[in-house]
Amino acid sequence: MAALCRTRAVTAESHFLRVFLFSRSCRGAGTESGSGSESSNSTEPRPRPGGFASALERHSELQRKAELARTRGSPKNVESFASMLRHSPLTQMGPAKDKIVIGRIFHIVENDLYIDFGGKFHCVCKRPEVDGEKYQKGTRVRLRLLDLELTSRFLGATTDTTILEAEAVLLGLQESKDSKSKEERRENK
């Protein structure tokens, strides 16, 4: 083994080269129990692990980075549920009774218009007699809310029963600036 680790005769000026060659030649002569058929060309880099081992290394590295980012994250960005609820549009709106909202017709069955206004439940309103053909799927309408959830407690029941609908009165179509300008152009012609 001492023969394998012997440094080559190098001039005194290249001390770094001596140390480098000594460490390179000693690397293969350690505790490995090979047949001595190691290649003399030890300048090749070690092969990277492949397959599952490399995937596991990458996954572990990503987990470490994510953990570091989580620990460094400022608590200002994290909002509590109570804070989110307090600042939600539904809570800011206050009591729903007699509020005017905008909804969109998403389903029609005969003369029943199913309107989504962004609440917990949709509402069902009758199609008006006047200009009923204007109320098509996708049309935006104005509503006056009466109740966000129709519930009732039946005789002898201990819990409320809901029909999964809100109660609202259909006020009419939502008029946009574009529709007003189109009507004015028609009247002027």
Swiss-Prot record:
Residues in coiled coil: none
InterPro entries: Ribosomal_bS1m (IPR019375)
Transit peptide feature, positions: 1-72
Chief localization: mitochondrion
Positions carrying Phosphoserine: 74
One GO CC term on file: mitochondrial small ribosomal subunit
GO biological process, one term: mitochondrial translation
One matching Pfam family: MRP-S35
Keyword Ribosomal protein part of the UniProt annotation: yes
Residues where N6-acetyllysine is found: 134
Keyword Metal-binding in record: no
Ranges of Low complexity composition bias in the record: 30-44
Residue span of region Disordered: 30-53
Compartments, record wording: Mitochondrion
Keyword terms: Acetylation, Mitochondrion, Phosphoprotein, Ribonucleoprotein, Ribosomal protein, Transit peptide
Similarity section: Belongs to the bacterial ribosomal protein bS1 family.
UniProt subunit comment: Component of the mitochondrial ribosome small subunit (28S) which comprises a 12S rRNA and about 30 distinct proteins.
Name by which UniProt lists this protein: Small ribosomal subunit protein bS1m
Species whose genome carries this gene: Bos taurus (Bovine)
Lineage start: Eukaryota, Metazoa, Chordata, Craniata, Vertebrata
Gene behind this protein: MRPS28
